[in-house]
A protein has these predicted regions:
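Structural preference for beta-strand elements that scaffold enzyme active sites
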Residues: 6-10, 47, 75-79, 100-102, ...
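Alpha-helix-loop-beta-strand connector modules within alpha/beta enzyme cores
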Residues: 58-81, 116-131, 195-222, 262-263
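C-terminal helical cap(s) of enzyme catalytic domains, especially alpha/beta-barrels
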Residues: 114-121, 228-267
């Protein structure tokens, strides 16, 4: 029997409030993180991801009080990211109630942090977030992928999508796995907030190159989009925000739709 796929709501938090952005820009207030987290937990979400989206760019600590409030309100696994730079930061987050930490900018800049985190907490606690954009500039040093738009490569971006790095996302995923990443949260910055579907080609390209679970993120607008990324995109989990926040498709409805489409989903 195939492993059950996971459905994961995401709380993008900016200064204590859940917001929703398009391409990580122009945030709009969407609700209170503790109230929304409890609602998702009660609705049957498999996990929850909490991302402090400005902690890295503002070079500040994560909002520990909000993390503690969310942890007390839910009964499902809980990943926290944004502003986690080292073992000390991760320990604070995990001691505040998180089950896993998501790391992004800090480990792109200092890759050995992945190994340090895995050595202390176990690789099952380390989620490596990869924010990527399509880059159509020919480059002999990159892994070119055949897509519907032609050959291109996927570039890692950091600081909430604000800074291009020149790093190939597929090569970075392989490196991060070797360093100790236990899971990847792959976000298409081209698709984020658009509600027109995930970047199937990005998700599939990374999934085919690593041997740890992949959470797909960026672009969910309807249940069919989740179906596509969980099947064609070979993702192990689908993360979404807008369709859940604005009640377009509540978690139970999405799960029911996916089951009817033949996807094995957790109860």
């Amino acid at each position: 029997m195939p492993l059950a796929k996971r459905i994961i709501p995401c709380l993008d938090v900016d200064h204590g409030k859940v917001v929703k952005c398009i391409n990580f820009l122009n945030p709009k207030h969407a609700g209170d993180p503790v109230e929304m987290a409890k609602s998702y937990s009660d609705d049957g979400a498999d996990e929850l991801v909490f991302l402090d989206i400005t902690a890295s760019s503002e070079k500040r600590d994560i909002l520990r009080g909000v993390v503690e409030g969310v942890a007390k309100a839910i009964s499902i696994p809980f990943t926290v990211g944004g502003g986690v730079r080292n073992v000390s930061d991760a320990r604070l987050v995990l001691c505040s109630g998180a089950d896993k930490v998501s790391v992004n900018t800090a480990v792109v800049e200092t890759p050995k942090v992945i190994t340090e985190l895995a050595d202390v907490f176990g690789r099952q606690c380390v989620v490596c977030a990869i924010d990527a954009r399509r880059n159509r500039t020919p480059n002999d040093g990159k892994i070119m992928v055949d897509t519907a738009e032609g050959k291109l490569w996927f570039e890692v971006v950091t600081y909430g999508g604000r800074k291009p790095t020149g790093i190939d996302a597929l090569a970075w995923a392989k490196q991060a796995e070797k360093l100790g990443a236990g899971e990847f949260l792959v976000t298409s910055m081209d698709k984020d907030g658009t509600r027109d579907g995930y970047d199937i080609e990005l998700t599939r390209a990374i999934s085919e190159r690593v041997n740890v679970p992949i959470i797909a993120s960026g672009g969910a607008g309807e249940p069919k989009h989740l179906f596509d990324v969980l099947t064609q995109g070979k993702a192990d989990a689908a993360l979404a925000a807008s369709i859940f926040h604005y009640k377009n498709y509540p978690v139970p409805i999405v799960k029911d739709c996916l089951r009817k489409m033949g996807v094995t989903i957790r109860k």
